[in-house]
Amino acid sequence: MELQEVLHMNGGEGEASYAKNSSFNQLVLAKVKPVLEQCVRELLRANLPNINKCIKVADLGCASGPNTLLTVRDTVQSIDKVRQEMKNELERPTIQVFLTDLFQNDFNSVFMLLPSLYRKLEKENGRKIGSCLIAAMPGSFHGRLFPEESMHFLHSSYSLQFLSQVPSGLVTELGITANKRSIYSSKASPPPVQKAYLDQFTKDFTTFLRMRSEELLSRGRMLLTCICKGDECDGPNTMDLLEMAINDLVVEGRLGEEKLDSFNVPIYTASVEEVKCMVEEEGSFEILYLQTFKLRYDAGFSIDDDCQVRSHSPEYSDEHARAAHVASLIRSVYEPILASHFGEAIIPDIFHRFATNAAKVIRLGKGFYNNLIISLAKKPEKSDV
């Protein structure tokens, strides 16, 4: 089975769906919103071609569920707010939004939510239906998605860590697995494995930057948010917990060791310095803003659908309930790729053990994601300067 067929979130609206388990990502978007607003402010001041008539925006790796349209709403509201601040008396521009993700993404569930979004934008922003046009653009952001110099603003949240393929070189010339008992480039992985993952990320991210530079207008903006390498004090990350859970099943004889050794997740969390160096070496973009922030990976447990902190309940301080919440999120992201390799029957057992291990980490006050926000502007052509 092709990687792109299984590298997607759980669709639909069931209990294991991404739509039902993405409150953590809502919190990330809320943290990024002030930077998004500043990005839009700089974009509108740059006075790009046609920007007063139609602003073209894309969400790269949009996934499905309410978070997809939360990004759209935040972008539209930021545009309208900044225009008001600038006392722009011209007629509101149409905003054209493209939602992009791999072909297997559940775009249909997103389309079902559009009427509600349009009503909300009309009520809160006075935007009449038809002044914000939303369409899907299925495809991989590791290749071209849009015509040359056609876009004003590109946004991506929590997608860039996914690679276009499992790195080559993870099996030796003798047919021996180089990344034994591991499922990604962990701290315990041998140096050749870590290098293979870094090389693949470098290739993918450099290609991503080059493709986006071709699609953006000169001085267009791009805002990226991704997980980056953390510190020792953060504790094991969720990929470590997933790896532990699968290893537990191998020890119990529920899974064969060869099945584990042949499984590698196409994901790489780069360091801040790696990302910064790659942007500078590719050369198409200027870094306008770069910041990191930490979030506990159970942070989404304590917020409601509007990103407000819920009143404390007996469950709030229960590490097992919080760990189960984290397990549900990770299952909604990785179940398709896990089920394609290990089979669907073992999935509940994997995430039962995941939750058990996560509870131990949470009890110790550890378990953090380190996040990177980076705002970029496409460098002007010499003729535009």
UniProtKB/Swiss-Prot annotation:
Pathway: Alkaloid biosynthesis
Binding site for Mg(2+): 179, 261, 263-264
Essential cofactor(s): Mg(2+)
Annotated site location: Involved in substrate discrimination: 155, 267, 344
The keyword Metal-binding is annotated on this UniProt entry: yes
Record function comment: May be involved in the biosynthesis of caffeine.
Protein name as annotated: Probable caffeine synthase MTL
Species for this entry: Coffea canephora (Robusta coffee)
Lineage of origin: Eukaryota, Viridiplantae, Streptophyta, Embryophyta, Tracheophyta
